[in-house]
Amino acid sequence: FRDDGVIQVRAGSTGPKFPYTPNEGHMHNFTWRLDVDLNGAGGDSAYLTSHSEDFMPPLSTATDGRERIVIEKGLLWNPRNFNTLLIEDSTLKNGSNPPRATSYELVPLRTGTARHSEPFTKRDFWVSRYDPAQSFLADNLPNYVQNRQSTVNQDLVIWYTGSEHHENNSRDE
């Protein structure tokens, strides 16, 4: 966490080159698990936000959207809509005038997405209710949301998968 509340994550990878295809580029998928407890466990809801702009002359317009995620599920990030995921507490208000709900906004990496054969790579965000048995990705995210439980005013866990394309170079020895 930074002083301004921003969560900054970093990921790196290392290892030997593939012995039979040493110059082949490939993708790395990173998944972060965020157990969001604003004002304690429970009372949190998630929203998929969007921002679209129309630059057709003579008028330019912008539209902001906010869709409440009401059941556990996986979500796709659409770069044309500048999607973000907003996690908001229903009872905790900040000091602005008028007071607004306290929230975190998850802004995805702008590096593109990878769709591989693993089921968890088919979506960018996953919203699930907290379950202590679901701490690791090994069981695959689609299994965590298959019950489609309510996510309104609950103890939420947000899973975010970002991808990086890796072109091999001389440092990868």
Please name every model-derived segment.
Residues 2-6, 16-173:
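Extended effector regions of multi-domain proteins
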Residues 9:
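Active-site-proximal segments of catalytic enzyme domains
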